[in-house]
Regions:
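NAD(P)-binding Rossmann-fold cofactor-contacting core
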Residues: 22-45
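A glycine-biased structural micro-motif
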Residues: 16, 41-45, 59
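Short acidic low-complexity segments
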Residues: 46-60
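Residues in the short beta-alpha loop(s) of Rossmann-like NAD(P)-binding domains
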Residues: 12, 35-38, 92
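N-terminal Rossmann NAD(P)H-binding glycine-rich loop of SDR-like oxidoreductase domains
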Residues: 8-21
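Glycine/small-residue-rich loop that forms an oxyanion/phosphate-binding "nest" at active or ligand-binding sites
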Residues: 61-93
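Extreme N-terminal starter segment of soluble prokaryotic enzymes
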Residues: 2-6
């Protein structure tokens, strides 16, 4: 079975950190991108943090979003353009 390439937005938040912890234990998932609005040049699980962008999401099959409502709309615009699936966990809409 092929692995699911996963991008996690808001990766430094409580839910983002939990998603990373769970994903690295799951053999069916490969984290290909971690995004955060701040703390660039930081590395988590061997992956450098990026800002939300086409480059960050290009290799992902699925984007899991745990950011803010404003940021979620940004993620959705990029995901739509790239035809990526998105799981939204953001609250506060």
């Amino acid at each position: 079975m092929a692995k699911i390439n996963l991008a996690i937005t808001g990766c430094l938040g409580r839910m983002g950190r939990q998603l990373i912890k769970t994903a690295v234990k799951d053999r069916s998932v490969k984290i290909v991108s971690l995004t955060e609005n701040t703390f660039l040049n930081k590395k988590i699980s061997g992956i450098y943090l990026e800002k939300n962008s086409e480059k960050a999401f290009r290799n992902a099959h699925v984007i899991i979003d745990f950011t803010s409502p404003k940021c979620t709309f940004e993620v959705l615009m990029i995901a739509s353009k790239l035809k990526k699936k998105v799981v939204i966990g953001t609250t506060g809409f």
